[in-house]
Amino acid sequence: MNPHAGIRDNAGATRNGPMFAASCIAFVATAMIFAIRSDILGDLSTQFHLTKAQLGWVILGAFWGFTITVFVGGQLCDLVGMRALVGLAFLGHVAGLLMTIFANGYTMFAAGTLLIGFADGFLEAVVNPLVSTIYPDRKTEKLNALHAWWPGGAVMGSVLAYALTKADQPWQVKQAVALVPVLVYGFMFLRLRLPRTERVQSGISTRRMYQEALKPFFILWFACMWLTAATELGPNQWIAEILKHTATKSGILVLAWITLTMAVGRLFAGPVVRKLSPIGLLAASAAASGAGLLALSYAHSAPTAYAASFVFAVGVCYFWPTMLGVTSERFPVGGAFLLGLMGAAGNASAGLAQPLMGFFYDTYGPARALRYVAVLPGLLVLVFGGLFMRDLAKGGYKVVKLGGQEPPPQGRA
C-alpha cells in the first residue's frame, strides 16, 4: 500500500473524522456569510446609496473572487499543499469581514466583499478534493453530506440575522457574527495534517490531469455546471429581498426554510443516489427546481411562499455536490484541477446571475425576476434526462476507479 494512503485503512475512519468535521465547519462559515449578506442587502443599498443593479455588481465581486481562487487553488492544491490554501482562506475571511464591518464607503465595502470571495474559493479548492481523497469509494455521498453544511450554515445565519433584526441590532453586528465559525474552522485545521490528493497518490501525471479536461463529456458537464449554479445561487441570494415585497415580510425565514430543506436532503442523499444514480437524481432535481421557481414567482402569501420554496429547495439541494461527485467519479484523473474548474464555472455563473437578477428586479419587478430564471432548469431536464437514458442503455451509471475495479453500476432499470 502507498505509504501516503494510510487514510484509507481501517484506522482511517478515526483520522478522517476530524478532517471531515473541519471541512463542514468551514462550509458553515461561508454559508453564514452568504445568508447574512442576503438579509442585509436592503441595509447595504441604503448605507452606500446603491440601486439593486449596482448592489448586484458588488455581490458579483464575491462570486468572481471565488471563481478566480477556486480555479487557481485547484491547481495549487497539489503544489503547495492543502494546508497552505486553508491558511490563505482563513486570513481572507477575517480581513474581508472586518473590511465590510468597518467600511467607510462603497470602495471599501466592495473590496471586502471581493476578499471574502477569494477566501471562499481557496476553501472550496481544498475541501472537495480532501473529502474525495479520504472517502474514495463514497465520493458523491460524502460530498453531499459535506455540502449539507452549507445550507445548514445558511439556516444558522438566517435565524441569527432574524433574531438580531428583532433586537434592533445594526447590520454590522449581524455581519460580525460570521467571524465565530471562521475562527473555529481556522483552529481546527491548524491542528490537522492533511493528505496529498487522490490523483497524486495514484501517480497520475500533471499532463494527464490537464488532458482530462478536453474530453467531450467533461466539456458538456462543465457547461451544465453553469446552468445548475445559476439556477441555485442566482435566486437564493435575492429570494429574501424578493419575497419581502411579494409574499411575506419575513423573507429571510423563507430562505432559512429553503436552506434547512437543502441540508436535510443532502444529509440523506446516499439512498437516493443509489436508487436513481447521480445523473438520474440531477434530472429529477432540474424538474423540481423549475417547478419551484415558477411557483415562487406566483406566491403572494406566506403559506404559498413556504410551499413553493420547499419544491425549489428539493430541486436545487443536490445540484452542486452531485455535479462535483460525478466529476470526481467519472473523471478522477482530473483530480483537484477539474473539481476547481467546476467550482470556478459554478461561481462565475452564479456571479453573472447577480446583476441580471438585479436588472430584472429593477425593470420588471421581483416576481418576474424569478420567472426568467426558470428557463434554465428546463434546459437541464433535457440534458440530464438524455444522459440518464444513455447510461441505462449502457448498463447503468459506472464509476471510474484509479487502480482498482469498478463498483456495480447504479440506477439500472
Show which residues each predicted segment covers.
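Extracytoplasmic
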Residues: P18-L50, P235-A240, A353-M357
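Residue-level signature of mid-helix packing/kink "hotspots" within the transmembrane helices
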Residues: A35, A62-F71, V155, T259-L267, ...
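Extracytoplasmic gate region of multi-pass secondary transporters
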Residues: R37-D39, L214-A263, A353-Q354, G358
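Helix-breaking motifs and short loop linkers at transmembrane-helix boundaries and internal kinks
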Residues: H49, G81, F102-T107, P136, ...
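Conserved MFS/SLC helix-loop-helix module at the cytosolic interface between two early adjacent transmembrane helices
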Residues: I68-T107
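Helix-to-loop junctions at the C-terminal end of transmembrane segments
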Residues: T69-G81, G265-P278, Y361
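Cytoplasmic helix-loop-helix junction between adjacent transmembrane helices
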Residues: G112-A148
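Helix-loop-helix hairpin linking two adjacent transmembrane segments in secondary transporters
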Residues: D137-R138, A145-T197
